[in-house]
Amino acid sequence: MGKIIGIDLGTTNSCVAIMDGTTPRVLENAEGDRTTPSIIAYTQDGETLVGQPAKRQAVTNPQNTLFAIKRLIGRRFQDEEVQRDVSIMPFKIIAADNGDAWVEVKGQKMAPPQISAEVLKKMKKTAEDYLGEPVTEAVITVPAYFNDAQRQATKDAGRIAGLEVKRIINEPTAAALAYGLDKGTGNRTIAVYDLGGGTFDISIIEIDEVDGEKTFEVLATNGDTHLGGEDFDSRLINYLVEEFKKDQGIDLRNDPLAMQRLKEAAEKAKIELSSAQQTDVNLPYITADATGPKHMNIKVTRAKLESLVEDLVNRSIEPLKVALQDAGLSVSDIDDVILVGGQTRMPMVQKKVAEFFGKEPRKDVNPDEAVAIGAAVQGGVLTGDVKDVLLLDVTPLSLGIETMGGVMTTLIAKNTTIPTKHSQVFSTAEDNQSAVTIHVLQGERKRAADNKSLGQFNLDGINPAPRGMPQIEVTFDIDADGILHVSAKDKNSGKEQKITIKASSGLNEDEIQKMVRDAEANAEADRKFEELVQTRNQGDHLLHSTRKQVEEAGDKLPADDKTAIESALTALETALKGEDKAAIEAKMQELAQVSQKLMEIAQQQHAQQQTAGADASANNAKDDDVVDAEFEEVKDKK
């Protein structure tokens, strides 16, 4: 069995890890970094860039550089959170035919799973380069508070990237695995506070150890899937835009290039203010008007940043209270607090969390790498490489169906340990009703319309009977990935209908297959591009070395040969500017054929040089003998 890699598919950065024996190892990407920016760019010449190369060119290509795509995955275009992003993102977010939030790049409509798959492909390639073998299986992490549609969309992204997703696990749970694996024995209850680039989670986890086996049991989880570092950046960007407008009378929001530069500067300033008390946002030539170029130079203090984001930090505290309440615990029951996600490096976040729990968070867990390490550990558990570890996760939101009067009737309550299965018997609302519609919902509100609709299906063929007589058994079955399977059965006729809940929109099988094929075609195109570059390099080398040999041959090369070679060199030079590998190879072949006389001359010159060199060495050796004899050491007799 091959390795199952662990991938933290983050909003801002992603990370990949593997199990090296019984030790998890975070892998460095081709650029030598342990984390990869979750940024994808589509260049003018049709190339797809992922990670640092995409980030570097963002300033000059803002409309075609996609970031924070995880905030759109599994979401509807009309969602309030998506509408907030539509107004601030430099790229175009559109409504797909099925109502999902998609992105349009260079006239092409793309689904978020398709874009996230590019990041997963980079993670896959990083692992393959390290292991020296193909990788086909992965454990991918998601925010604990992701709903069913978002989990499905993440699995779809894995498939499009050519990965079989063996398990979807929650990010805080993965961080707890990374933390608990190498800590000493004994039972403890931990709180994992995970504030990443785009999402926030809190999980209360109990680690029990019995006879050397560790059980990680999630007691409760809560969060906000649209709260993270990107929101902190936005607050600072808005402040800088307003200050510049006051000072210069120009609104930078109308200038995508300026906004992209500002985004990078704001992110950098935010990071600097975690260790410094103040910083300068200095952007020369940020824009221009009729009077000439304009420069931005604004001082930002840590106190100013904190005042801008205080409500965001406070927003993360409410879920902590709910999670503790759901777990039936008080603050004093928590033994350790673990911070995960880059945004937790902000001193204000650390201070608020410490105040809430009454203890300092642990500093020995790497907030950027813990989640990927935990995913790799879970991969090791699935392959059998990691023993004595049992993971008991929960479903983050209640699941149920719509019943008479537009009420949601819960079948599986939030924070139920998964996998789990629950059945309940319902009946008809009308006399002689021959079909029922099962409308599946996820959420905590009593009114069905206020919850997330996961889909619906019909159960037909119910025998005519007075209302309330037929017995319809509805079964909810949640698998270990937290994905829901629903069945409805008429106990009288034995008729049954089953579905795996796909997002009421989501990608259908044909769309996923097409995206998988496109990804494979891209891989083929990438391979051909690599071969073309290698051939070009060989052609360049041949061009350079032939010109040098023509120069060295001088008058020894007959004029006819020289003319033929010059003509072949020009033809090769032209071919090298094109995109046709076969044409370059053909011109290299032609050059080699007309250069035979040149090769002979070069070989003769080389042989003469070697002979001359050998003669010179022999003469030197004779001279050396004379010198040595002259300076022969004579020891005095004592």
From Swiss-Prot:
Keywords: Acetylation, ATP-binding, Cell inner membrane, Cell membrane, Chaperone, Cytoplasm, DNA replication, Membrane, Nucleotide-binding, Phosphoprotein, Stress response
Biased composition, class Low complexity, residue ranges: 602-620
Listed InterPro entries: ATPase_NBD (IPR043129), Chaperone_DnaK (IPR012725), Heat_shock_70_CS (IPR018181), HSP70_C_sf (IPR029048), HSP70_peptide-bd_sf (IPR029047), Hsp_70_fam (IPR013126)
Residue positions where N6-acetyllysine is found in the record: 109, 245, 304, 421, 556
Membrane topology classification: Peripheral membrane protein
Post-translational modification: Autophosphorylated; GrpE inhibits the autophosphorylation.
Disulfide bond entries: none
HAMAP family: DnaK (MF_00332)
Subunit structure: In pull-down experiments interacts with CedA.
Family per record: Belongs to the heat shock protein 70 family.
Name assigned to this protein: Chaperone protein DnaK
Record lineage: Bacteria, Pseudomonadati, Pseudomonadota, Gammaproteobacteria, Enterobacterales
Gene of this entry: dnaK
